[in-house]
Amino acid sequence: TANNLLSAIIDNHIFQGNELNIDPAKITHERCMDLNDRSLRNLKINGVDVHFNISTASEMMAILCLSKNENDLKTRLGNILVGYTYEEKEVFARDLQCVNALFLLLKDALKPNMVKTLENNLALVHGGPFANIAHGTNSIISTNYGLHHFDYTIVEAGFGSDMGALKFFDIVVR
């Protein structure tokens, strides 16, 4: 929802006069959905190429899972590069003054989910961006929670040892 809100804000900004002078052909932020429909990956809307991703492959999912707290989440949301102006200047989400709206949609999602396994053990399930676009594990918050409150914390790193383990050691463990 937050990802597509940002897409709608970009579109509306351009429609309402484009004060930031965003070039519609140079929008880098991609729309997303939870259905892997290959026909929606590359579209042309109003003469502009538009791309859809699945949620787990979105920058928004990576940001949610890499954020350490609410302030970190806000900072990362503001740093989303949404595109470029006709003059090749970068435009960030913070330039559209929408960070608080995005944050309000994501603040509860920042909290890990506690579930019970079939063996009656507690498990934290939270996030999971793909390793080809992000760190490929659950959220940093849930890992840190597990490390501070339990005897054992198990983290699954996606995409095998060549990518998943490398990103786990380079990004998550730090």
Which positions does each model-derived feature cover?
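Flexible phosphate-sensing "switch/lid" loops adjacent to ATP/NTP-binding sites
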Residues: 1-174
